[in-house]
Amino acid sequence: MAKIYHDSDADLKVLKGKKVAVIGFGSQGKAQSMCMRDSGLDVVVGLRKGGKSWDDAKKNGMKVAPVADAVKGADVIMILIPDEVQGKVWKGEIEPNLKEGAAIDFAHGFAITFAVIKPPKNVDVIMMAPKSPGPMERQVYLEGFGVPALIAVQQDFTGNAKKIALCLAKGLGATKAGVIETTFKEEATSDLFGEQAVLCGGVTALIEAGFNTLVKRGYQPEIAYFECLHELKLIVDLIQKGGMMNMWTNVSNTAEYGGLSTRDKVINAQSKEAMEKLLDDIIAGKFAKEWVKDANGGMKKLQAMEKKEAESEIEVVGKEIRSLFEIKAAPKAKKAPAKKAPAKKAAVKKGAAKPSVPAKKAAPKKAPAKKAPAKKKGKA
């Protein structure tokens, strides 16, 4: 079983009086730097001067400096910029300004596992990887809790690498939820596999294949969209909340029987062999090499794939369907002219007859509410 750490296993004092440089102010950089600051750590954000992120960080009350200046003298450098630009920023602005004994922290194992970055031997190399998008991390932190995270130690020059990783996790609030220990290789390869085989690649391919099958057989594209894409969120929410069995027990018996009895016909032995091959290619570094090459060449292959996806029938139909659910803001009503204050009524003298007020009609009696029929037992 995995080793899981909690609040009592981490100490923010480990980085008391230390300088933490966060490189980047995107989804992860923004959330992590602000949470670390609010947890009492001394944080400076390293950015390109004059960019939008620079202004955004300033507006959010962060100390900001050019990347090279932020790294100089820093005890911890958190590299929270996209995988594809880490190598260039490392060589040009981070590595030349490192001090001995500093800790280099990553939120993803890609750069170290696939040798995009090769740190010197006289620094700690750690990972603190929250399992959530940045905005959610920040929201949960402000609510007094935290999101789960992973930690790993690749290189322990000082002997304090794990303590520093746990301190960063506590600064984010992650130790309140639970922090799992892993390795850079395990995180990097499993993360890429999950994205490609299931979350981003597998699911979208399955959705499109289902949609195209129905449309090809003469079904209306709008109906196919609802059945193969729109309703997916309902199912995923049930799984995320309580696991597979929570989903099976909350769908109809027909859906449960059909799903369990036919799923191996779709994800069959051939599909599973393809997954094995995909994982082998990831572990061997084949995918990393291909991605780094495309990123360094201007992302031409990625852009071509994006264009093809954007022009697909399911995307065109999806825009139509989603527009049906848009809530348009009602036009602002014109302000009515201010009413004049009513004139004060003259006081009625004692003994004088009061002005007659028309009697109100009695409200009609409501018919007694009918009892709702008892619900049948069983699934919705």
Residue ranges and their predicted role:
Residues 19-32:
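Glycine-rich adenosine-cofactor-binding loop
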Residues 105-196:
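Rossmann-fold dinucleotide-binding core
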Residues 30-31, 37-60:
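NAD(P)-binding Rossmann-fold cofactor-contacting core
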Residues 337-374:
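Low-complexity, polybasic segments enriched for Lys interleaved with small residues
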Residues 1-17:
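A short, basic/flexible loop-to-alpha-helix module at the beginning of a structural domain
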Residues 221-234, 242-243:
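Small-residue-rich helix-loop
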Residues 209-212, 216-217, 242-304:
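Interdomain hinge/lid region at the active-site interface
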Residues 68-117:
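Rossmann-fold NAD(P) dinucleotide-binding segment
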